[in-house]
Curated annotation (Swiss-Prot):
Pfam entry (one): ThiC_Rad_SAM
Pathway assigned in UniProt: Cofactor biosynthesis; thiamine diphosphate biosynthesis
Molecular function GO labels: 4 iron, 4 sulfur cluster binding; carbon-carbon lyase activity; zinc ion binding
GO cellular component labels: cytosol
Enzyme Commission identifier(s): 4.1.99.17
Co-factor requirement: [4Fe-4S] cluster
Cofactor binding notes: Binds 1 [4Fe-4S] cluster per subunit. The cluster is coordinated with 3 cysteines and an exchangeable S-adenosyl-L-methionine.
Sorted UniProt keywords: 4Fe-4S, Iron, Iron-sulfur, Lyase, Metal-binding, S-adenosyl-L-methionine, Thiamine biosynthesis, Zinc
HAMAP family: ThiC
Protein name: Phosphomethylpyrimidine synthase
Organism: Neisseria meningitidis serogroup B (strain ATCC BAA-335 / MC58)
Length: 633
């Protein structure tokens, strides 16, 4: 195996940065007035994290009313636990090791299986960049299948399935029995477009999870070499998830930046992370990320394979790509984007497009097909890819290499031809019991978004859909987190299981930490809006709690319950910075005399007073009649 012919220049301070890599990057996760809570499963080592936001009391003329804590889904892992000791150089605790050992269908390999992995492990030039706590990789024993889909089809409920059932339920079954939550748990009926959305938290059971996985409608991306993972589920009949991208490039960003960006993404709520690195030290960057990631990590293996050829697509080979798959699988990558649906005969269909082929992976494979005038080797070797995937339980994210790059190209012949091929490949992967999700567009005008979901459900047999947006207009560079967030909320409502975030830098440059924050918050909004629209149990709880806090002028609770407490408070404090303003019954928008909510409260107080006066008069009238109705005695 040869080393890459070209690599980007890296910072001369990389080694020093790694040596100084802060142990407290994650300790800064001090969510305001929040508490980390663990929900206990059927065994001691199933401890499912959530965050509870504590609220202040409400003070009224009638006395004090306690407001209960609000549970929220938490992706921050140990970084959100104030009691945890975090050392990025040591990696995260291995919470799944006992589960893997007990199943008895994997083995610890004596060494790495990938030629390139072995080469990197013994290269003295990368010694200063290596994560030093690497353990030997696992692989399925000969004849064994270790995927969550395989277990589900055998009727087995794994600890991972129980974990995600508890996580999705968010103890709402318990709260629904408590009177203080009765009003807060009220919500509008959703429209699910035929999805099998649970109607009550009690229905979100480990058996329900198993059934959804067995049917192929959901996946738990959980590589057996990622024991640090806190399991999560991606499926139409569960909470809508979001993915955050990171990765260095040939022109900018360093290894340490990507590790910090990953941790930063978790703080704001990324459910999964895709490492899209295309620059130097891809292998080492990925190792640091996975060892410190409590969420699933996805990659596009063709990017690294291309780096190994010096960026020459024509030089790609099946053997090189196969070695890259094994290399990444043994590091612990949980899902691979594989552009196996870009077929030779589809490439000419893109000739009349306004923007042609915009997917990096799609363009790489299209160029290879044309250069060799042969069928895509990812398609012709698909069964062999499945054999690798099921040996490590890596999930497919079947790539949309022919997705539209502008709304003019949306829903065209080439896009849907590829989608239909992805359905064919889904069926083939399922015969190997390999988990599958389907990637989708892209750029689609709003009126044509639903058609994408309909086509995917029909031709890909309800495998989870994973979409990039879609962007519903092309006129807003710098604001594409908004143009795509609009499409994302809609397609999430229609049934998309996971939304890939878009940052303000889309089409313009590599995002920095603030861009990542903005992208994730925007997509948390879109996913939550979709959950509300499809009627996910308890989805409206946080909305109701925040609305109540707003009406009662509990400013601090408004900040705490928001998706971005820091930004909400900073915007408030720009005009009313005094501490007393946080208990004032008005804001700078209307002022004290014109606040609609303050006026409404005064009207209610007046009405209550009038009601009391009327009641008093009525009582006096009754007393007067009882005494004989005489004016003078």
């Amino acid at each position: 195996m040869t080393t890459p012919k070209k690599t980007a220049k890296t910072s001369g301070n990389e080694a020093r940065e790694l040596a100084d890599l802060s142990e407290d990057i994650g300790i800064c996760f001090k969510y305001p007035n929040s508490e980390r809570v663990y929900l206990q499963g059927s065994r001691d080592d199933i401890r499912v994290p959530l965050r509870e936001i504590r609220q202040d009391d409400t003070y009224t003329a009638q006395g004090t009313e306690a407001n209960p804590p609000i549970p929220v889904y938490d992706t921050s892992g140990v970084y959100g636990d104030p009691a945890a000791h975090i050392d990025l150089k040591q990696g995260l605790p291995h919470i799944r090791t006992a589960w893997l050992d007990e199943r008895g269908d994997t083995e610890i390999l004596p060494k790495l299986s990938s030629e390139y992995g072995i080469e990197r492990a013994h290269d003295p030039k990368t010694a200063h960049l290596r994560f030093n706590q690497i353990t030997r990789p696992r692989r399925a024993k000969s004849g064994s299948n270790v995927t969550q889909l395989h277990y589900a089809r055998q009727g087995i409920i794994t600890p991972e399935m129980e974990f995600v059932a508890i996580r999705e339920r968010l103890k709402l079954d318990e709260l629904s029995q408590k009177p203080e939550y009765a009003k807060l748990l009220e919500q509008h009926a959703g429209q699910s477009f035929g999805a099998n959305i649970p109607t009550h938290p009690d229905q979100i059971t480990p058996e329900f999870v198993r059934q959804e996985i067995a049917a192929g409608r959901a996946i738990i991306p959980a590589n057996i070499n990622h024991p640090e993972l806190e399991p999560m589920i991606i499926g139409r009949n569960f909470r809508v998830k979001i993915n955050g991208n990171l990765g260095n490039s040939a022109v900018t960003s360093s290894l340490t930046e990507e590790v910090e960006k990953m941790v930063w993404s978790l703080r704001w709520g990324a459910d999964t992370i895709m490492d899209l690195s295309t620059g130097a030290h891809i292998h080492e960057t990925r190792e640091w990320i996975i060892r410190n990631a409590p969420v699933p990590i996805g990659t596009v293996p063709i990017y690294q394979a291309l780096e190994k050829t010096g960026g020459i697509a024509e030089d790609l080979t099946w053997d090189l790509f196969r070695d890259t798959l094994i290399e990444q699988a043994e590091q612990g990558v949980d899902y691979f984007t594989i552009h196996a649906g870009v077929l030779l005969r589809y490439v000419p269909m893109t000739a009349n497009r306004l923007t042609g082929i915009v997917s990096r992976g799609g363009s790489i494979m299209a160029k290879w097909c044309l250069a060799h005038h042969r069928e895509n080797f990812l398609y012709t070797h698909f069964d062999e890819i499945c054999e690798i995937m099921k040996a490590y339980d890596v999930s497919f994210s079947l790539g949309d290499g022919l997705r539209p790059g502008c709304i003019a190209d949306a829903n065209d012949e080439s896009q849907f031809a590829e989608l239909h091929t992805l359905g064919e490949l889904t069926d083939k992967a399922w015969k190997h019991d390999v988990q599958v999700m389907i990637e989708g567009p892209g750029h689609v005008p709003l009126q044509r978004v639903k058609e994408n979901m309909t086509e995917e459900l029909q031709h890909c047999f309800e495998a989870p859909f994973y979409t990039l947006g879609p962007l519903v207009t092309d006129i807003a560079p710098g604001y594409d987190h908004i143009t795509s967030g609009i499409g994302a909320a809609n397609i999430g409502w229609y049934g998309t299981a996971m939304l890939c975030y878009v940052t303000p830098k889309e089409h313009l440059g590599l995002p920095d930490k603030e861009d990542v924050r903005t992208g994730i918050i925007t997509y948390k909004l879109a996913a939550h809006a979709a959950d509300l629209a499809k009627g996910w149990p308890g989805a409206q709880l946080r909305d109701n709690a925040l609305s109540k806090a707003r009406f009662e002028f509990r400013w601090r609770d408004q900040f705490r319950l928001s998706l971005d407490p820091e930004r909400a408070e900073s915007f408030h404090d720009e005009t009313l910075p005094a501490e007393g303003a946080k208990i004032a019954h008005f804001c700078s928008m209307c002022g004290p005399k014109f606040c609609s909510m303050k006026i409404t409260q005064e009207v209610r107080d007046y009405a209550d007073k009038q009601k009391a006066q009327r009641q008093g008069m009525e009582e006096k009238a009754v007393e007067f009649v009882k005494k004989g109705a005489k004016i003078y005695s």
